[in-house]
């Protein structure tokens, strides 16, 4: 096994800070690809840095905004290619003038983020900080997010690539890497060039602590309900008025009372009314449906149709219309058919002394769209925490550990050649 000191932590930290300073906040209201110019700027930086590192075929593809590169196999074995993927955009939070702050040899106490705003990063509020004692912790200055989601993943992939390039005697198969746009708004991977990428499977490095592997996600849909009322003067309304507000309330009352985000965790799903506008004459509801269990997910979609049909049956003509847009499918249904992908990562965790944690991801990742395109893609980790806000942080050591895991997965793929661990994986 490689040693953690075999990895260039200085390069990893420098690249992370350089990339973090680029504003790559994605914009759900934009219709360009990518949605913001900062993502193009960073993609071209990543392309150049890959070339400088020694990845000769690295290229930025304007048609999909992905940067793709590969490390050719040096093995005489007929090894399938493995992919590693990270995203370049950041969440919908201030990303202008990001100034990463490095705190060497973190002592376990409070970290002052911004004295003027009296903002501190405290282990009392964020207990996972205690795991970073003695490490080089990188934080915000309290005015922006940091962008460890997912620039920590980007930097870690660079660290793994450099390991192989500086250790040419280490046997490996083809390694493909991809860095893409607009993950935070669920668009980027829809354009992922799966045929060109051509790996048997891949991993995203999107959030989470060392040892984490997320091999299942929600099934997800969004629903739009439009209600047509009949508005008349209240004094003359008998037998005439149809109050769209009342119908909207009837719909919401028919939804499962306990299947809401504030009452669900682990493998429990939910139906959430995200917003509503309502007058007597018309009402509009937007909902999201999230569920791990595919059969229950289908039942919940059917339930919405039943509720709408039941109301419409009370009137001479339909008053309520329902449109459902299916957003992504649970990758677990596919990953269960390919247990080697999860076992490969778990075996590496055990070898490195990392405690594994198979957790359901209560959301979606780029892996959903990529899996749907034929490349099973669970999520690992990037070592950061408190994503999407001013308390976000990561450590140089955690990113370096991520690089080591990436490298060892590639090497374990060689070691298991001809005798893969295909034992069933229990996800739930």
Report each predicted region and the residues it spans:
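Active-site metal-coordination/substrate-binding segment of hydrolases
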Residues: 78-174
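Short coil/turn connectors at secondary-structure junctions
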Residues: 76-82, 133-135, 169-175, 197-201, ...
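Midchain, well-structured core segments that form catalytic/ion-binding scaffolds
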Residues: 111, 135-148, 181-305, 309, ...
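Short, conserved micro-motifs enriched in small and acidic residues
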Residues: 37, 144-155, 238-246, 393-400
């Amino acid at each position: 096994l490689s040693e953690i000191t075999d990895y260039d932590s200085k390069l990893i930290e420098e690249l992370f800070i350089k990339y973090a300073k680029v504003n790559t906040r994605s914009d759900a209201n934009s219709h360009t690809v990518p949605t913001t110019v900062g993502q193009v700027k960073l993609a071209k930086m990543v392309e150049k840095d890959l070339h400088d590192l020694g990845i000769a075929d690295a290229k930025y593809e304007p048609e999909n905004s992905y940067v793709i590169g590969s490390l050719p196999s040096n093995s005489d074995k007929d090894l399938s290619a493995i992919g590693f993927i990270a995203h370049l955009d950041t969440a919908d939070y201030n990303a202008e003038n990001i100034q990463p702050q490095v705190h060497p040899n973190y002592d376990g106490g409070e970290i002052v983020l911004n004295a003027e705003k009296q903002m501190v990063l405290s282990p009392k509020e964020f207990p996972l900080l205690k795991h970073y004692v003695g490490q080089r912790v990188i934080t915000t200055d309290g005015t922006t997010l940091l962008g460890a989601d997912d620039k920590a993943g980007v930097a870690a992939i660079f660290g793994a690539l450099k390991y192989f390039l500086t250790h040419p005697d280490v046997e490996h198969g083809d390694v493909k890497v991809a860095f893409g746009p607009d993950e935070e708004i669920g668009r980027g991977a829809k354009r992922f060039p799966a045929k060109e990428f051509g790996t048997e499977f891949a991993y995203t490095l999107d959030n989470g602590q060392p040892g984490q592997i997320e091999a299942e996600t929600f099934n997800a849909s969004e629903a739009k309900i439009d209600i047509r009322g009949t508005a008349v003067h209240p004094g003359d309304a008998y037998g005439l008025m149809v109050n769209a507000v009342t119908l909207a309330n009837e719909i919401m009352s028919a939804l499962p009372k306990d299947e809401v985000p504030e009452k669900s965790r682990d493998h429990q799903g939910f139906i959430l009314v995200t917003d509503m506008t309502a007058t007597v004459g018309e009402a509009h509801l937007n909902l999201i449906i999230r569920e791990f269990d595919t059969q229950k997910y289908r039942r919940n979609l059917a339930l919405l149709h039943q509720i709408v049909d039941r109301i419409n049956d009370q009137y001479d003509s339909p008053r309520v219309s329902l449109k459902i847009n299916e957003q992504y499918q649970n990758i677990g249904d596919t990953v269960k058919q390919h247990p080697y992908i999860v076992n490969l990562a778990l075996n590496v965790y055990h070898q490195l002394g990392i405690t594994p944690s198979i957790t359901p991801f209560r959301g979606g990742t780029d892996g959903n769209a990529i899996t749907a395109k034929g490349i099973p893609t669970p999520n690992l980790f990037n070592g950061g925490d408190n994503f999407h806000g001013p308390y976000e942080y990561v450590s140089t050591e955690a990113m370096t550990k991520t690089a080591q895991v990436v490298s060892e997965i590639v090497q374990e793929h060689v070691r298991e050649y001809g005798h893969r661990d295909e034992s069933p994986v229990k996800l739930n």
